[in-house]
Design a protein with these regions (language model features):
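Long amphipathic all-alpha helical oligomerization modules
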Residues: 37-38, 42-136
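Conserved alpha-helical segments that form or flank metal/cofactor-binding pockets of metalloenzymes
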Residues: 26-38
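Short, structured motif recognition centered on aromatic/hydrophobic residues
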Residues: 22, 33, 121
């Protein structure tokens, strides 16, 4: 239907923006944050001094990551609202139904990723850095 096709174009644009932002986000994690976490773990295991970090404290990039997580959470709440809870209209084609199903699965996986980082990885990393900074 025309409505379904207009919805598909709108949803596709929102998802495309999300993927673009998430790619940049993942690059920051993979190139900046996670290598430093690795260095912290290595320093802890080898009982060596904490290496210098160009961002100062790990809290700086973590606060950026968490703000970006919040932005994505808002974006997917908006997508969920626009798609009526990822529910296709009665007259929607099967392709659009499949897109919504996959979009919902993606959102759930993203939500899990955000939960693990915000509630486990980031707090533990901040604590580890603080303990390592206390060592002589």
């Amino acid at each position: 239907s025309l409505v379904g096709s207009e919805m598909c174009i709108r949803d596709r644009a929102l998802f495309h923006d999300s993927l673009s932002d998430l790619n940049a986000h993942l690059d920051k994690e993979e190139l900046v944050l996670f290598p430093y976490i690795y260095e912290m773990v290595k320093a802890k295991l080898e009982n060596t001094p904490l290496p210098e970090f160009h961002c100062g404290s790990i809290e700086a990039p973590i606060s950026v990551m968490m703000a970006e997580h919040d932005i994505e959470g808002e974006r997917y709440r908006h997508i969920e609202h626009l798609t009526n809870g990822y529910t296709a209209p009665e007259d929607a084609c099967n392709s659009y139904r499949l897109v919504l199903q996959q979009l919902k699965a993606f959102e759930e996986a993203l939500h899990q990723h955000i939960h693990l980082e915000n509630n486990i990885v980031f707090p533990r990393s901040i604590k580890m850095e603080a303990k390592l900074r206390e060592q002589p």
